[in-house]
Amino acid sequence: MRPQITFQIIEVLTGSEDREGRLVLVDGRLAAVLVRLSDQGHEPLLRGAWYIEAGFGFLDGRHELFASFDEAVASIERNLS
C-alpha cells in the first residue's frame, strides 16, 4: 500500500520573517518541516522558495531548497518510492 502524505499548516519560529511552514506527515508520522523563505535577507530569487528546515527518517539530513511547494511535494513523493 502506498504511504499517505499529508500536510499541516503551521507557523515556525525561525528567528526571521520565514514563518510560513508545513508539517509533512507520512502515514500520520512527522517526516519533515518545510519553511517558505520570505525574509528580505534572502536573495530575491530565493524568496518564495520552500526549504526542508528539518527532516526525519528518510528525509534526515536533507536540507534541500525547492522553487515551489509542488516541487517539494514531488521530491518527497519520489523519495518514498
Regions found by a protein language model. Give the residues of each.
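Short aromatic-glycine-(Arg/Gly/Cys) micro-motifs in beta-strand/loop hairpins
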Residues: 33-62, 79-81
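Alpha-helix N-cap recognition
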Residues: 68-71
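Short intrinsically disordered terminal tails
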Residues: 1-2, 77-81
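Negatively charged, low-complexity tracts enriched in Asp/Glu with abundant Ser/Thr
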Residues: 1-30
